[in-house]
């Protein structure tokens, strides 16, 4: 990888340095950055670093990150799940449908909302039933995004 300073900063002992490095790397378009972001998303002990890695991966829209993002939508911290879902929506394939549908029942409404958006982008008719159930969600934003997703599916 020719981004040696980025590698060094991504592994810095200071969490704040790693956290800011992730966001900075989102602004660079070199392919060599995506593996650095994926590694941090998968392995960093700080949820804030993992969240920022997901945010940066959304900016890259690189399908090679989909495996890592798919794992991260099961992260213990809701913000990591939310932003990983948002990034995954940019590189979606139907193989992630079941994982995304499960997130329509997440404890956090932001995660449920992102799942509805992702299902709309995915465009699979298999999402219709779960999206219809989300029309009764307690959170209005989830209901709105579920309705929009259904409209994208011509329902």
Where are these regions (language model features)?
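Alpha-helical adaptor scaffolds
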Residues: 47, 55, 67, 71, ...
């Amino acid at each position: 990888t020719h981004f040696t300073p980025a590698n060094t900063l991504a592994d810095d002992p200071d969490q704040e340095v790693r956290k800011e490095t992730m966001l900075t790397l989102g602004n660079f378009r070199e392919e060599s950055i995506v593996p650095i972001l994926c590694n941090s998303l998968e392995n960093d002990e700080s949820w804030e670093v993992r969240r920022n890695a997901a945010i940066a991966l959304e900016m890259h829209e690189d399908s090679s990150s989909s495996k890592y993002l798919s794992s991260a939508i099961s992260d213990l911290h809701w913000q990591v799940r939310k932003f990983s879902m948002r990034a995954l929506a940019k590189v979606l394939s139907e193989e992630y449908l079941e994982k995304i549908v499960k997130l329509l029942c997440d404890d956090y409404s932001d995660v449920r909302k992102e799942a509805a958006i992702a299902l709309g982008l995915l465009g699979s008719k298999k999402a219709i039933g779960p999206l219809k159930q989300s029309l009764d969600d307690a959170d209005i934003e989830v209901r709105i995004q579920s309705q929009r997703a259904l409209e994208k599916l011509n329902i």
